[in-house]
């Protein structure tokens, strides 16, 4: 879907909301013309993290947006997939709660993001002070709250997934195997999701430093060949 602060489900400005809804509908129409079945969208984090608008204000806005967009998705034969991320408004708990009232519709589901879930999962070796600088901003109320078992919680609603790796501290979008995710354990779990429609790579091919941190990619970035070979070895 269209991505960014102006296109999130929970944007508060009325004029921006009207534009967001209109363009998201158009985005679904174009995606369907290209044969897409799912349409992944973010609840939104910018206005919570940087404007510090509380969740109690933002949740109803996201709900209202889905009320408007789901009928369009039903008409097109598409599924809106709400994605888990590493900010409080996009946690697995929040996206499950947001989609709860709409689960009678065939046009709503979830997108499981492997890298986002890895950042939020606890681990014996993790240290809070090692998280990327933007994590405390994303969890400004009570600090970073780990969220374990996101896949299990979301599993029955997952219709698509974003596949990439990281070091557990930053949203680096590295190649599977270059981070801390246990792919031998994760892949069978992904494949057992009963409503999964597709698997998508979200590996960032360009190496070096970006907004999220320093990529694990080699100098010159990841090659398409390595990407294809890696995903084939994983069984995709």
What is each residue range found by the language model?
Residues 4-112, 119:
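Active-site acidic/histidine proton-transfer and metal-coordination neighborhood
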Residues 2, 6-9, 175, 180:
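Residue-level preference for alpha-helix termini and adjacent loops
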Residues 25-29, 35-37, 60-63, 89-236:
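Histidine-acidic metal/acid-base catalytic patches
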């Amino acid at each position: 879907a269209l991505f960014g602060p102006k296109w999130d489900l929970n944007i508060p400005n009325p004029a921006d909301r009207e534009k967001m809804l209109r363009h998201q509908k158009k985005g679904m129409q174009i995606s369907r013309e290209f044969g897409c079945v799912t349409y992944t969208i973010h609840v939104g984090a910018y206005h919570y993290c940087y404007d510090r608008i509380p969740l109690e204000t933002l949740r109803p806005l996201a709900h209202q947006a889905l009320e408007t967009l789901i009928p369009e998705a039903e008409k097109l034969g598409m599924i809106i997939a709400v994605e888990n991320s590493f900010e409080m408004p996009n946690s697995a708990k929040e996206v499950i709660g947001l989609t709860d009232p709409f689960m009678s519709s065939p046009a709503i589901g979830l997108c499981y993001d492997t890298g986002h879930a890895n950042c939020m999962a606890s681990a014996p070796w993790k240290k809070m002070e090692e998280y990327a600088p933007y994590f405390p901003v994303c969890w400004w109320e009570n600090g970073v709250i780990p969220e374990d078992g996101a896949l299990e919680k979301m599993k029955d609603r997952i219709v698509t997934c974003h596949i990439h790796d990281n070091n557990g501290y930053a949203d680096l979008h590295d190649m599977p195997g270059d981070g801390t995710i246990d792919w031998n354990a994760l892949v069978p779990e992904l494949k057992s999701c009963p409503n999964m429609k597709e698997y998508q790579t979200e590996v960032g091919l360009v190496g070096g430093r970006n907004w999220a941190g320093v990529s694990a990619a080699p100098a010159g970035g990841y090659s398409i060949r390595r990407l294809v070979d890696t995903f084939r070895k994983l069984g995709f």
